[in-house]
């Protein structure tokens, strides 16, 4: 073996022992006649002391991130020289042998201390970035997440199954990544956006309880904090209700939070209906760590003469202390609203009397009653949105979050809880597609709520889904549903969606065929594993918990991907081949 001990494991009990270590030079200090090295490996750091002699000569020429093998004796540090910041701070290794295993070129950025370099450079040298404590810690936390999830699944007698990465293209809302099939020129595989159809087939197969840590791929425009390839903990169960799936999901989440965040979640988690979440928070993934709930003022302004409030819906949200904002700060709110598609953002400032651009246009009764109607106090600001209900609620939801950011309402120092998790249940089954028809809010195999099972086609806009999302601190971390297993219900859903029988067979024929053979009632959930890891690691971006992530533009600075292919590769892959000419048949349904 190259080493006998790991650097970060040495303790006072090891004093007097001879050890052989291997690792990297995190820090070097030459005090003339004696050289101190901080030697780092995956377990931690220990101080190495090299005095005159061969070891000292070698130590005097090493530099940051040289890879070394060190042999010597563990000794207690002299009294007063202990380092409480290191777990090994009570001991040091007095080296009598130092071997340079490999040298390191000058670093593009330091791997100790703060890093002032752009993200693209960090990703280009990701292998160096991962030597830093934070990124390395995040990957180890993620590994623990995987272990704990598997323990929970095993306890509930689930079977871990790997589903295909090379499959056929099926519509799931985003574009597929396509892979040419060389042996069938002109034909293409698709990388799966999720294992949705395969896990339902496993339920038809009688497996009953399935899970996997599934890699998923979506070729979508990059926005917010997305990656083209991501991981989810994917779960499917037979003979279950919504409550059954949610109880299992809570076991997974409670285990993760207990073991990795030291937080015991109170179960069962609170549940809000989709309608309630939108009404109170303007979001289907509300952050419940703070208040500032939306106030519905539609009835309050029912007889108003103010034209902007003569709308189907009027709502407001209060900013504590907002009346003290400068004019430029108040103008920023208009810019904020316009960036979200609104014309602006009306407001009043609460003091001895109401002030602001619209205050003078309110009636005496409206001015007198508005503070009580909204719960605003002197010194607060009240922001309004009016118009179509959902759009107005979403704008106020965004304003609410911005208020929290500016007022630091989610800061534990302000009294906010560190964590707030909840379920959002009973979402719409369908939503308008913008062309006079309907589209599935989730996917076309989502079951209606039992009370809507026989009448969803009559009022698609009111029908509710047997679906559920789990939210943590305003982040959706998982979602699922009960699936349709009855052929007649599935056919009626397709009819609402405007999907003909021929189109359904072309897109989902293999699944519909399987459903002819006694499919069980089933449902499931998928957790956004990257997002959960980011939350538990306390980092802002999921890129910080992925070993080799892509940039916001979808590129990989480390490998240079994506890259062009050669003409020879293009020809060999059959990218330009006509599949119908090759098969000797006219255009139509392609073989699966």
Curated annotation (Swiss-Prot):
GO terms for biological process: aspartyl-tRNA aminoacylation. ATP binds at residues 218-220, 227, 476, 528-531. It is found in: Cytoplasm. InterPro entries: Aa-tRNA-synt_II, aa-tRNA-synth_II, aa-tRNA-synth_II/BPL/LPL, Asp-tRNA-ligase_1, Asp-tRNA-ligase_1_N, Asp/Asn-tRNA-synth_IIb, AspRS_core, GAD-like_sf. Its EC number is 6.1.1.23. The keyword Ligase applies. Belongs to the class-II aminoacyl-tRNA synthetase family. Type 1 subfamily. HAMAP family: Asp_tRNA_synth_type1 (MF_00044). This is Aspartate--tRNA(Asp/Asn) ligase. The lineage of its organism: Bacteria, Bacillati, Actinomycetota, Actinomycetes, Acidothermales. The gene is aspS.
